[in-house]
Amino acid sequence: MKMKRCRSCGEYTLKEVCPHCGGRTGVIYPPKFSPEDKYGAYRRKLKRELYSRGSGESK
């Protein structure tokens, strides 16, 4: 079991649904570091795409 945090109210819990507000919870731990970084190229590509979309819409 891992500690989770509610995305709506910020309360900590071990459940999938927040007992305080009924909101969704997410794992609070960062992903494990790996020097190989199998998904690094995908993450960088997605970040570039999101950045280019965001800057293009603001003009």
From Swiss-Prot:
This is Ribosome biogenesis protein Nop10. InterPro entries: H/ACA_rnp_Nop10, H/ACA_rnp_Nop10_sf, Nop10_arc-typ. Involved in ribosome biogenesis; more specifically in 18S rRNA pseudouridylation and in cleavage of pre-rRNA. Keywords: Ribonucleoprotein, Ribosome biogenesis, rRNA processing. Belongs to the NOP10 family. GO terms for biological process: pseudouridine synthesis; rRNA processing. PANTHER family: H_ACA RIBONUCLEOPROTEIN COMPLEX SUBUNIT 3 (PTHR13305:SF0), RIBOSOME BIOGENESIS PROTEIN NOP10 (PTHR13305). One of its GO terms (cellular component) is ribonucleoprotein complex. It comes from Methanothermobacter thermautotrophicus (strain ATCC 29096 / DSM 1053 / JCM 10044 / NBRC 100330 / Delta H) (Methanobacterium thermoautotrophicum). One of its GO terms (molecular function) is snoRNA binding. HAMAP family: Nop10.
